[in-house]
Amino acid sequence: NDVEWFYFGKNGVPKTGPQEGEATTSDFISINNKKYLFNPLGVPVYGLQRVYTSRSKNDYTAFYFDENSRTSQKGKMTIEEEDGTKSTFYFQDTGKGYTGVKDNSLYYMGKLQKADEGTKYEVIHIPGGSSYVVNTSGKISKNSAGVKDADGTKYSTNSSGVLTKIDGVSVSGSDYGREANEPIWKH
């Protein structure tokens, strides 16, 4: 028995929102200090959602809405992505997917970034940010004079885990490594 519920405004009209995958943070509805997002039919959405943080189609991140309460969630959790993969995510108190280093782990749009299996270590670049050396568990390598990946490439990092050298050669700029993996979206 699937039950759907609606939220009616003071004018008696149900609150509605955009198509999934097209929402912006201004589409959120706050009810009793809890954040909701509604679809065009007025039904609150749930699951991992791509939400635009500005009018630019390049500015978006992940929010996660609980299947039962339909509210925006915060903190660290394991979520099944659209392709069935279970991944670790971290959401800020605002519900926004965290980007950066948290508890010595690297996150992008809330998703934990890990080196590919069999590589030991991998350089992962956060778009608009820095490149980090990460192991297969998602932990960054800090203050390292040289950790080696499975191919023997040696990486050095600073106290923040940012890549400083590859095979002893200083690197400048931040565009090294593979780009961080986005969450796997519904739409």
List where the protein language model places each region.
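Extracellular adhesion/carbohydrate-binding repeat motifs centered on closely spaced tryptophans
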Residues: N1-H187
